Amino acid sequence: MAREGEGGGRGGREERDSEFVDRLVHINRVAKVVKGGRRFGFAALVVVGDQKGRVGYGHGKAREVPEAIRKATESAKRALIRVPLREGRTLHHDVNGRHGAGRVVLRAAPAGTGIIAGGPMRAVFETLGMHDVVAKSQGSSNPYNMIRATFDALQREDSPRAVAARRSLKVSVLQGRRLGGDTETAAEG
């Protein structure tokens, strides 16, 4: 008999975890040199998201591939960030990010554009729940640097509400400026 308020034991945890979608971005065979030779293991890079604006990435190492993926997934779930999305489908504004020699440019796109992104960035946008974005990667094509540069860019993304609060403005005034309809200059022109 399941106790009330605990989600039915282990089943409650499984239901909570099922809200996340994970994508394996990269798997790498690594070697540790020891006295008797080399010990081989695996390193996994995983991206996890809820497809509603939260996403995280994690890195896990183990002697077997499934264990490395499990560790990376747990690490990603502990490192989730929230990204504000416009209309639940794209970015509010264009943004750049960098990590090491990896640079990425993320651009907001009109509805119906789809995810135009290469390699590891596509996994980030799919797990984030973004439907329309144009992304370009420059410099390093190392998946670790591309993921970190993408997350750097996503953390720079601000919603109009956050920008308005920072500037002590109303959101409607800020939106009017974005659309080019400042009321005072429109009356003069």
From Swiss-Prot:
Belongs to the universal ribosomal protein uS5 family. PROSITE patterns: RIBOSOMAL_S5 (PS00585), S5_DSRBD (PS50881). GO terms for biological process: translation. GO terms for cellular component: small ribosomal subunit. GO terms for molecular function: rRNA binding; structural constituent of ribosome. Gene3D superfamilies: 3.30.160.20, 3.30.230.10. PANTHER family: MITOCHONDRIAL RIBOSOMAL PROTEIN S5. With S4 and S12 plays an important role in translational accuracy. Located at the back of the 30S subunit body where it stabilizes the conformation of the head with respect to the body. The keyword Transmembrane helix does not apply. This is Small ribosomal subunit protein uS5. Keywords: Ribonucleoprotein, Ribosomal protein, RNA-binding, rRNA-binding. Disulfide bonds: none annotated. The N-terminal domain interacts with the head of the 30S subunit; the C-terminal domain interacts with the body and contacts protein S4. The interaction surface between S4 and S5 is involved in control of translational fidelity. Residues 20-83 form the S5 DRBM domain. Pfam families: Ribosomal_S5 (PF00333), Ribosomal_S5_C (PF03719). SUPFAM superfamilies: dsRNA-binding domain-like, Ribosomal protein S5 domain 2-like.
